[in-house]
């Protein structure tokens, strides 16, 4: 009982900090961080350093616990519960003792970005729809260009391009700009932004 009351957490107990990663890190990320830190403090590279062996063993233990799914779940549960005992003592307890202890466990951190729920077939269908939209835009663009050319020819006949003060010159340019604005279809990204889906 005294051990629990006098317990002080050590930095070596936080395996995520020891490896330099986060509780949301994947196994691949954990292994990559382990390799970097293991190369820095490997006992073979630093034979004169007496703490190199101890540090390497802690890194190895952290990697073993965090790369195993079951032991990582137990470690995360212990870490979030903030129990006043070391992880080794927690592991030594039987499941019945763990069940009889009541405490509030903090939840896991939320992801900053949501994972994609789309399946590969959904992505292919979306890509096909995007291609069809682009083809329609290109067709629409070529027809509008033809219309613009016809309009500009008729405008050239009725108004002098060298005289911008002629009565209908400004009106023609405004109509041209309005037509372009109405012809531009909003992109899918813009639609999602406007509908607060992003």
Swiss-Prot record:
- Give the J domain ranges: 14-79
* Highest taxon, organism lineage: Eukaryota
Assembly description:
Interacts with HSPA8. Interacts with TPH1. Interacts with TPH2.
N-acetylmethionine occurs at 1
| Compositionally biased spans, kind Basic and acidic residues | 120-156
User: Is-annotated flag, keyword Coiled coil?
Assistant: no
Gene3D superfamilies, per the entry:
DnaJ domain
Region of interest (Disordered), residue spans: 112-167
Spans traversing the lipid bilayer: none
Among Pfam families, the record links this protein to: DnaJ
Kindly provide the name given to this protein in its UniProt entry.
DnaJ homolog subfamily C member 12
Described by its record, this protein's role is as follows:
Probable co-chaperone that participates in the proper folding of biopterin-dependent aromatic amino acid hydroxylases, which include phenylalanine-4-hydroxylase (PAH), tyrosine 3-monooxygenase (TH) and peripheral and neuronal tryptophan hydroxylases (TPH1 and TPH2).
Phosphoserine carried by residues: 160, 166, 182
- Quote the InterPro entries the UniProt record gives: DnaJ_domain, J_dom_sf, JDP1-like
What keywords are assigned to this protein? Acetylation, Chaperone, Cytoplasm, Phosphoprotein
Q: Does the keyword DNA damage apply?
A: no
Q: Which species is the source of this protein?
A: Bos taurus
State the compartments where it is located: Cytoplasm
What GO cellular component entries does it have? Answer: cytoplasm
